[in-house]
From Swiss-Prot:
GO terms for molecular function: structural constituent of skin epidermis. Residues 411-421, 443-452 have a biased composition (Polar residues). The gene is Krt80. It comes from the Eukaryota. This is Keratin, type II cytoskeletal 80.
Length: 452
């Protein structure tokens, strides 16, 4: 049984050899070496082996063309299967390497695109000072506005406090005036009560005097009546001198006139005194009533003014409380805005630091990928040059030398029209070696004829 093994790889030598079954020594003649290009570098099949150049005429001994009884060696079949498995594994590895190379090329293109984009946006990405300055200016403007509002609020608060102090002074003055007026009112009330008591006493005295006058008048009239009756009823026998005449009626009239004059004068004096006292008390009462009315009016006015001042004080206090609350709210808002600005600035700095770290990491990754790409490009270029050199070497004409061999295996190989060349395997640094083994169709046909 004969098989052909082809060694394909990224090396400077590639060959295809034909080995007869059961042979232990490699032949020195064959079809010639055939080169198999690496994947992606040529359109020729991996399983094809074209003749190298023009084959010269070969002279063969006819005795060597006698068919032999050949049998298939199981070791060769096992070796062939093993080599096929190795070929599959190596082909899979080669395909995975090609996929990795393509993925790296795509990633390289993606990184180049990203690098170009980042270079295009480099100035916009790293030039954040303008944004910081704008944001800081806006915060300073807000802080300035808050400071102005705080100054205005403090000025208005001072004005309100001055007004409150003024109202407090006025309120204290009004309170002192009210206290004085209340004291005056109490004094006037006391005087009025005293005068009322005196008036009552005088009225009582007047009534007593009037009763006394009436009593005296009644007594006088009764005495006068009694005296008149006595005078009329008493008959006096007086021995008088006829020469002396006494006018008793005149005397009685005179006494009566005196009594009447005394009673009238007493009555007039009592009436005049009572009238004067009453007029005086009435004048004083009217004066006290007027002062009391004026005091009541003043007290009512003071009460109204006090109520107004109290309402104004309450409104001013509420306004002061509102202003204090507004100041506190403004301070809290300013502190919150300042803290928020600090937090945002810290976040921006953290984002900038993170962006710088990401950029540095991407640059390191890009540098690593560029190094990997450069190494792969160098390796691919080397493999490409090696394959081009191998293809150029394979395109040159080769000579075939056939010699007769005494061994049975070589005779069988010459009868079957097959020869082989020593398999050339050259280790390549970093490149996989793929060995392809195929059955010779011609040898299989001869083997079938021999079995028949």
């Amino acid at each position: 049984m004969a098989y052909r093994s082809c060694v394909v790889g990224f090396s400077s030598h590639s060959g295809c050899e034909v080995t007869p079954a059961g042979s232990s020594q490699p032949g020195t003649s064959g079809w010639g070496s055939c080169g198999l290009p690496g994947p992606g570098f040529s359109s020729r099949s991996l399983t094809s082996c074209r003749p190298a150049g023009v084959i010269p005429k070969v002279t063969v001994n006819p005795s060597l063309l006698v068919p032999l009884d050949l049998k298939v060696d199981p070791a060769v079949q096992q070796q062939k299967n093993q080599e096929k498995e190795e070929m599959k594994v190596l082909n899979d590895k080669f395909a995975s390497l090609i996929g990795k190379v393509q993925a790296l090329e795509q990633r390289n293109q993606l990184l180049e695109t990203r690098w170009g984009f980042l270079q295009g946006q480099g100035s916009a990405t790293f030039d954040l000072s303008h944004h910081y300055e704008t944001f800081q200016g806006r915060l300073q403007e807000e802080l300035r506005k808050v400071s102005q509002e705080r100054g205005q609020l403090e000025a208005s608060l001072l004005q309100v406090l001055e007004k409150v102090e003024e109202f407090r002074v006025r309120y204290e003055d009004e309170i002192s005036k009210r206290t004085d007026l209340e004291f005056t009112f109490v004094q006037l009330k006391k005087d009025l009560d005293a005068e009322c008591l005196r008036r009552t006493e005088l009225e009582t005295k007047l009534k007593g005097l009037q009763g006394f006058v009436e009593l005296m008048r009644t007594v006088y009239e009764q005495e006068l009546k009694d005296l008149t009756a006595q005078v009329k009823d008493v008959s006096v026998t007086v021995g008088l001198d006829s020469r002396c005449h006494i006018d008793l009626s005149g005397i009685v009239e005179e006494v009566k006139a005196q009594y009447d004059a005394i009673a009238a004068r007493s009555l007039e004096e009592a009436e005049a005194y009572s009238r004067s006292q009453l007029e005086e008390r009435a004048a004083r009462s009217a004066e006290f009533g007027n002062s009391l009315q004026s005091s009541r009016c003043e007290i009512a006015d003071l009460n109204v003014r006090i109520q107004k001042l109290r309402s104004q004080i309450v409104s001013v206090k509420s306004h002061c409380l509102k202003l204090e609350e507004n100041i506190k709210v403004a301070e809290e808002q300013g502190e919150l805005a300042f803290q928020d600005a600090k937090d945002k600035m810290a976040q921006l700095e953290a984002a900038l630091q993170k962006a710088k770290q990401d950029m540095a990491r991407q640059l390191r990754e890009y540098q690593d990928l560029m190094n990997t790409k450069l190494a792969l490009d160098i390796e691919i270029a080397t493999y490409h040059k090696l394959m081009e050199g191998e293809e150029s070497r394979m395109d040159l004409p080769s000579t075939t030398v056939v010699s007769a061999v005494q061994s049975r295996c070589r005779t069988t190989a010459s009868k079957s029209g097959l020869s082989k060349t020593p398999s050339r395997k050259k280790k390549n640094r970093g490149g996989p070696v793929i060995k392809i083994t195929e059955m010779s169709e011609k040898y299989l046909s001869q083997e079938s004829e021999a079995s028949e």
